């Protein structure tokens, strides 16, 4: 049965979802209620991007940003080719990540190389970039609901102009737990570390995860 995501997000029109979802992600209690509802609606299956068809039908910016989304079979093939040809240490990079479909496929294939009781979120770290305002909330949600670790750059991969950057971390290091989120400060230090130039005045001071020293250490791993 097709999931009615507008009903789950409690909106009348799909254009309202990105802004509302972004606000929910910064409220731990509210987002975890949403996460559980999404998990139940998708039979607890986190192997793929649930929003692939919904986002492509309702939110894709095909004219302005030439957005199209990678089919699951292609994402699976790409992931397996990389893992088989080069080995895989769990570090993942993707520009133009969209809502995270290829990233999720890689994460899923990677975690399945471990026994369920042996895998820990610290074994996989994703560094992903995306330009679209509409995609970013879904990309963040997809990482957080799966208990992933990583950094999300909201900006232009080519010019390195960056509107915001987000640190996603599973502080319990437990793949049955959700991840938290911090907005990375717009400072010269982080511009240098992330190779970006912050250009947006819309910085939201949200540092729920940990002390900055811990963030620095993770960035320098």
Descriptions of predicted regions:
Residues 1-221:
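Class I S-adenosyl-L-methionine-dependent methyltransferase catalytic core
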